[in-house]
Amino acid sequence: MSAQRLRIAIQKKGRLSKECQELFKRCGMKFNISGERLVVHSENMPIDLLLVRDDDIPSLIMDGVVDLGVIGENELEEVRLERKALGEPSAFTTLRRLDFGGCRLSIAIDKDAVYNGPQDLAGKRIATTYSQLLKSFMDEKNIPFSTCILNGSVEVAPRAGLSDAIADLVSTGATLEANGLKEAEVIFRSKATLIQREGEFDADKAALIDKLLTRMQGCIQAKESKYIMLHAPTDKLEAIKSLLPGAEDPTVLPLSSDGAKVAVHLVSTENLFWETMEQLKALGASSILVLPIEKMME
């Protein structure tokens, strides 16, 4: 692995792995991940991907071993707090929050328990993988508690008699419900984020990072946007434009065969819901198309 190539650490397996790989491919990076390889070389860019455990990524960044990393904010903050407590380097730069990996770290209790607030957790034993985030939350509330640290299957701890409650990642809440638990407190909200090590970069690496960030912005914006095309009566054009959630003013073009109508094109940064389409139709709009956008650049 050459020091001249940009080194990016990503999760080898898990909830962020697939979407992270897809994002880099949408940014134009060509690579082939197969087998148990730990380092993957991009075929068309001077970039190496390191496939590692998610909890190793923050330390690789903070120790300056890799240049960039994609990591869940929950894992990043857990490691930062742990290293800070140990007096180890914990600096990094956040380049941008990404549009996937959303979850929350929550305290969950028995589904039949009455819960009046954080004070009800006083003196309780709480099972978690995220002991630092839990401690930070409970200390801020000045609530005494004890921790049962587990590295998996946290949700079964109360039934096994290991704890009174748990603090674990929640996406939909289905796992909690299946284990007879309910959310009581949200400790931390998280998404995937792109981070960078501290220190200087040479001109080539800095330019490559800027290029990746620009492409990521385009990919994320395209994913959140739609291209809308329709035909509109000229006498209802202003009313129709007021219904369209466009990023900029729409493009209005004459139709060759119908002087009473124009073609309206625009990029929408919001979803065009069925109700809006029905309102457009009621105003006389026709040939309404809502299309996905693969890439865009402002």
Curated annotation (Swiss-Prot):
<keyword id="KW-0479">Metal-binding</keyword>
<dbReference type="InterPro" id="IPR013115">
    <property type="entry name" value="HisG_C"/>
</dbReference>
<keyword id="KW-0963">Cytoplasm</keyword>
<comment type="function">
    <text>Catalyzes the condensation of ATP and 5-phosphoribose 1-diphosphate to form N'-(5'-phosphoribosyl)-ATP (PR-ATP). Has a crucial role in the pathway because the rate of histidine biosynthesis seems to be controlled primarily by regulation of HisG enzymatic activity.</text>
</comment>
<dbReference type="GO" id="GO:0005737">
    <property type="term" value="C:cytoplasm"/>
</dbReference>
<dbReference type="GO" id="GO:0005524">
    <property type="term" value="F:ATP binding"/>
</dbReference>
<keyword id="KW-0808">Transferase</keyword>
<dbReference type="InterPro" id="IPR018198">
    <property type="entry name" value="ATP_PRibTrfase_CS"/>
</dbReference>
<dbReference type="InterPro" id="IPR015867">
    <property type="entry name" value="N-reg_PII/ATP_PRibTrfase_C"/>
</dbReference>
<dbReference type="InterPro" id="IPR011322">
    <property type="entry name" value="N-reg_PII-like_a/b"/>
</dbReference>
<dbReference type="GO" id="GO:0000287">
    <property type="term" value="F:magnesium ion binding"/>
</dbReference>
<keyword id="KW-0028">Amino-acid biosynthesis</keyword>
<keyword id="KW-0328">Glycosyltransferase</keyword>
<dbReference type="InterPro" id="IPR001348">
    <property type="entry name" value="ATP_PRibTrfase_HisG"/>
</dbReference>
<dbReference type="Pfam" id="PF08029">
    <property type="entry name" value="HisG_C"/>
</dbReference>
<dbReference type="GO" id="GO:0000105">
    <property type="term" value="P:L-histidine biosynthetic process"/>
</dbReference>
<comment type="similarity">
    <text>Belongs to the ATP phosphoribosyltransferase family. Long subfamily.</text>
</comment>
<dbReference type="InterPro" id="IPR020621">
    <property type="entry name" value="ATP-PRT_HisG_long"/>
</dbReference>
<protein>
    <recommendedName>
        <fullName>ATP phosphoribosyltransferase</fullName>
        <ecNumber>2.4.2.17</ecNumber>
    </recommendedName>
</protein>
<keyword id="KW-0067">ATP-binding</keyword>
<dbReference type="Pfam" id="PF01634">
    <property type="entry name" value="HisG"/>
</dbReference>
<keyword id="KW-0368">Histidine biosynthesis</keyword>
<comment type="pathway">
    <text>Amino-acid biosynthesis; L-histidine biosynthesis; L-histidine from 5-phospho-alpha-D-ribose 1-diphosphate: step 1/9.</text>
</comment>
<dbReference type="GO" id="GO:0003879">
    <property type="term" value="F:ATP phosphoribosyltransferase activity"/>
</dbReference>
<dbReference type="InterPro" id="IPR013820">
    <property type="entry name" value="ATP_PRibTrfase_cat"/>
</dbReference>
<keyword id="KW-0547">Nucleotide-binding</keyword>
<keyword id="KW-0460">Magnesium</keyword>
